[in-house]
Amino acid sequence: MFLLLAACAARPAGAQDEPRVQVFGGYSYTRFDSRSFGFSDSSGLNGYNFSPAFNLIRGFGVAAELSGQYGSKLNFRDLAVGPQFLYPRGKTLFFAHVLIGSARSFVRVGAGERDTERAVALGGGMDLDLTSRFAVRVFQVDYLHTTLFDEKQNNLRFSTGIVYHWGTLKRKGHRAPVQP
């Protein structure tokens, strides 16, 4: 994870333009650490991931994320925001983020239990441009740390989908000298 953050922070001289705004929507699968809830194994949850991001300067922006994953006896949703680091290479955009927010879980056992607690997501991924406005998020992987029901959960989320982007943060080049 730290290597991905370091790679995103290093800016080569020939870096490509970056999108000003990105909106991602897609499928997600979470391997949820539900053993702390009394389940015998971790739960495989399917759902969605939605993430708008606004890139402030080259290589850095702010991202928000809303996701929901659902299983037969367990639902999990999170909302988080934080810094995003970008590293464009040709038609590929690598990114890493650190998001902090809250998670909500509903366990359908007996009368059912709900809890909302803090959540931290550390992750990154890769987008591949299809057109000037659309890209496919080839992969996004997030480590999610939650503390639902006064227990720690270490979860892993995989996402893929479509990214819509507009506006660009252009590379600053040399200006031609003004002729008198």
Protein language model features and the residues they cover:
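Gram-negative (and chloroplast) outer-membrane scaffold detector with strong preference
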Residues: S51-G123, L128-L130, V136, Q140, ...
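Solvent-exposed loop/turn segments connecting transmembrane beta-strands
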Residues: R35-L45, Q69-R77, G110-A111, T147-Q153
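Predominantly the C-terminal beta-signal and adjacent terminal strand-loop region
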Residues: T131-P180
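Short stretches within intrinsically disordered, low-complexity N-terminal or propeptide regions
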Residues: C8-P12, G123
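Generic short beta-strand segments
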Residues: Y27-T30, G101, V141-L144
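Short glycine/proline- and aromatic-enriched beta-strand/turn motifs that initiate or cap beta-hairpins
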Residues: A13-L56, V62, L66-G68, R157-S159, ...
